[in-house]
Amino acid sequence: MAADPKDTTVTDENTETAATAEVETVASAPTSPAQKLSAEALIKAFETEQMKSDLPEIYVGDTVRVGVRISEGNKERVQPYEGVVISKRHGGMNQTITVRRIFQGIGVERVFMLHSPQVANIKVERRGKVRRAKLFYLRERVGKATRVKQRFDR
């Protein structure tokens, strides 16, 4: 008897086990809220994997040099940006620092995500001695008044 093209019965043992495995995976799909938390755990695990481990301890008031990756055409270079850390925000993967510097007499502030691929490296040039968590008052100061005392114990 010739094989009928409309015949859909399959007697291969491997395909039978594959079909039963598909049925089992469909049955074990997450339906309860407890199993949906595993997705959050998966995201958190991915974020911790992406975090940089070679970052120095950065405090508000420190003078830092941030190496910023800049791509011009098909070339990529690292441009240093040096200034005083005036604020730190968030934590973990989304941690940011705001760095302020004076360029040609004008105050320039940039916010850097510490774990971003655009940040090539960070080096602490000097430690600052401050008594505030945010140094926004430096925005109104001019000249020597913007200097932060140096801290030697860290």
UniProtKB/Swiss-Prot annotation:
Biased composition, class Low complexity, residue ranges: 16-27
GO biological process, one term: translation
Assigned keywords, A-Z: Ribonucleoprotein, Ribosomal protein
Gene3D superfamilies: 2.30.30.790
SUPFAM superfamilies: Translation proteins SH3-like domain (SSF50104)
Sequence segments annotated as region (Disordered): 1-33
Keyword tRNA processing listed: no
An MF annotation (GO) of this entry: structural constituent of ribosome
Family: Belongs to the bacterial ribosomal protein bL19 family.
Designated name of the protein: Large ribosomal subunit protein bL19
Organism: Parasynechococcus marenigrum (strain WH8102)
Name of the coding gene: rplS
